[in-house]
Design a protein with these regions (language model features):
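Solvent-exposed, glycine/polar-rich loop segments of beta-barrel outer-membrane systems
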Residues: 55-57
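Cleavable N-terminal export/targeting peptides
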Residues: 1-21, 418
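Outer-membrane beta-barrel pore domains
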Residues: 21-29, 47-49, 63-67, 108, ...
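Outer membrane beta-barrel
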Residues: 22-51, 62-224, 231-236, 240-247, ...
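C-terminal/domain-terminus segments
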Residues: 219-238, 354-365, 370
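Residue-level detector of intrinsically disordered/flexible regions characterized by low predicted structural confidence
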Residues: 4-5, 81, 349
Length: 418
C-alpha cells in the first residue's frame, strides 16, 4: 500500500481524465442521438492444460467467456443505443444501450445468461443535484467507468476482472467441505460495472479550470439482472477533483484527475465491500494512470471444472463469501502517441487474492504491452500482448498448477457508430 501511495504522489506532481460520470449521465444539448460500437476480437492463449483424474485444473488457459477454446475469433461486443433529451429545456435526459454479443453479459461459461439490456436510465436536471434512476454504470473504478470503445487495452486488468466484475451464483448452499465456499453456475451475466437504483450527482466548478465531482447511489445490488431486490442494497460513493489542462472535449479532454470511491453492499451470501483511489493524467501525447483497489467479502476465486469426465468440462464459478476474506491490487498504465495514428501502450497490474488465508493466497502479475492504430475518430485496431505470471506462495500443489499460466495475445478491431 505504501508503494501505491508513493506512485500516486508522483503522478500528482503533474498539473485520460475524462469525467465519465457527467459524460454518461447527462446530455449537453437537446436532441436524440443513436450510437453504438462493434468489437471483433481474436485471442490466443499460450497456457498449458492440466487434467488430473478427469478434472481440468487450468481454466486460465482458455478464452473467456465460455472457456472452451485456447484460440478464438469472436464478436466481443455489439452494442447499440439511443441517448438524448425528452424536453426542449434539456432538463430530462435518457440513456439506452443494448448488448447482443455472446460475451460475459449474455453467455458466461456458455450458460446463455442472456440479458440484452445494459443501460436504461432517466436523468432529471431540475435541481442543483442531478437525479438519475434506472440501470446504469455506478461511479467507481476508472477502469470500469471508462467507455470500452475508448480504451486501447482489450481486456481488464486482473484486479478489475476478478475483484470488481461481480459474478452472481445460482446457489445459496455452501460447498460440502468448506462452509465459506460456494460453487455454482452463473445466475446471470457478469455485473459489467452496473446496477439498478437511484443516483445523486453533480460536478461543481471550483475555479477557472478545476472541478469537484460528487456522487452517491443507492443500488439494488443485482447487477444487470431484470429483477430488483433492495434487500441486497448497495451504497456507492464517489468523489473526484479534476483540473483541465488544455484542448479536447468529452473523452479526449486533456486533464489531471484525482478520485476515490467506496462501495458497501449486502448480498444473500455475505456483505460485499470495495473501495479504491487513483489518478489520471492526459496532456498532449502522454496518458498516465494509476489505481489501487481493495475488497472484503464475496471474493471471486475463479472457474472450477466439476465434471471428472476427461472428455468434457463443466465450468462453474467459485466464491469465498465471508467478509473476513480480503483481496487487493493495483494497476499502472501509460500510453504515448508516436504519430497521428499510432499509439504505444503499456500496463502493469498486480492482484493479491485471499490475503487473509495463507493456503488460499494467490498472486497474479501481468505486464501488457501493445500498439493501437487509429483509423478514424475511435475506429482503430488494437494489438495487446499480456505476459502473465501467477503463484501460490504457501500452497505447493496450487503453485505447480499455476506454472501452466500462459501469455495472451489479443487483437481487436473497434468500429464506433455515431
Amino acid at each position: 500500500m505504501k508503494n501505491i501511495i508513493v506512485l500516486l504522489s508522483f503522478f500528482s506532481t503533474f498539473l485520460s481524465a475524462a469525467n465519465w460520470l457527467m459524460l454518461q449521465g447527462s446530455e449537453s444539448k437537446v436532441g436524440h442521438h443513436p450510437w453504438g460500437f462493434l468489437q471483433l476480437r481474436f485471442q490466443d492463449n499460450g497456457g498449458e492444460v492440466q487434467i488430473n483424474n478427469g478434472i481440468n485444473k487450468t481454466p486460465f488457459s482458455y478464452i473467456k467467456p465460455t472457456l472452451q477454446h485456447q484460440s478464438e475469433l469472436q464478436v466481443a461486443r455489439a452494442r447499440l443505443g439511443l441517448r438524448g433529451s425528452l424536453d426542449d429545456a434539456n432538463k430530462i435526459n435518457y440513456f439506452l444501450l443494448g448488448e447482443v454479443a455472446q460475451n460475459g453479459v449474455n453467455n458466461s461459461l456458455a450458460t446463455h445468461t442472456d440479458n440484452y439490456l445494459m443501460d436504461a436510465s432517466i436523468t432529471l436536471k431540475h435541481l442543483p443535484l442531478y437525479i438519475r434512476f434506472g440501470r446504469f454504470k455506478y461511479a467507481g473504478s476508472e477502469e470500469g467507468n471508462m467507455a470500452r470503445f475508448a480504451s486501447p487495452f482489450i481486456v481488464f486488468s486482473t484486479v478489475g476482472d476478478q475483484l470488481m466484475l461481480e459474478r452472481f451464483l445460482d446457489t445459496k448452499t455452501p460447498y460440502v467441505s468448506n462452509p465459506d465456499l460456494y460453487i455454482a453456475k452463473p445466475a446471470e451475466g457478469t455485473g459489467a460495472y452496473r446496477d439498478t437504483g437511484i443516483q445523486l450527482f453533480q460536478s461543481f466548478k471550483l475555479a477557472q479550470a478545476s472541478y469537484l465531482t460528487l456522487s452517491y447511489m443507492l443500488g439494488s445490488g443485482t447487477g444487470i439482472k431484470n429483477e430488483i431486490d433492495f434487500h441486497n442494497h448497495t451504497h456507492y460513493g464517489y468523489v473526484s477533483y479534476e483540473n483541465i489542462l488544455g484542448k479536447g472535449k468529452g473523452y479526449k479532454q486533456e486533464a489531471f484527475k484525482l478520485y476515490a470511491w467506496h462501495q458497501d453492499g449486502q448480498r444473500d451470501l455475505a456483505d460485499r465491500i470495495r473501495y479504491g483511489l487513483g489518478t489520471t493524467y492526459f496532456y498532449d501525447k502522454l496518458h498516465l494512470e494509476a489505481e489501487y483497489m481493495k475488497g472484503k467479502g464475496m471474493i471471486y476465486t475463479g472457474a472450477k471444472d466439476t465434471d471428472n469426465n476427461i472428455n468434457t468440462n463443466n465450468w462453474q464459478y467459485s466464491l469465498q463469501a465471508s467478509k473476513k476474506n480480503e483481496a487487493d491490487g493495483y494497476y499502472l498504465l501509460g500510453t504515448y502517441e508516436l504519430a497521428k495514428q499510432f499509439e504505444l501502450i503499456a500496463r502493469y497490474d498486480v492482484y493479491n487474492r485471499m490475503t487473509n488465508l495463507k493456503n488460499e493466497y494467490r498472486q497474479f502479475k501481468t505486464l501488457t504491452t501493445g500498439i493501437s492504430y487509429k483509423l478514424k475518430d475511435y475506429d482503430r485496431v488494437d494489438i495487446n500482448y499480456a505476459y502473465n505470471k501467477a503463484s501460490a506462495p504457501h500452497n505447493q500443489a496450487a503453485d505447480q498448477i499455476l506454472k501452466s499460466f500462459g501469455n495472451l495475445l489479443s487483437i481487436q478491431y473497434t468500429i464506433v457508430l455515431k
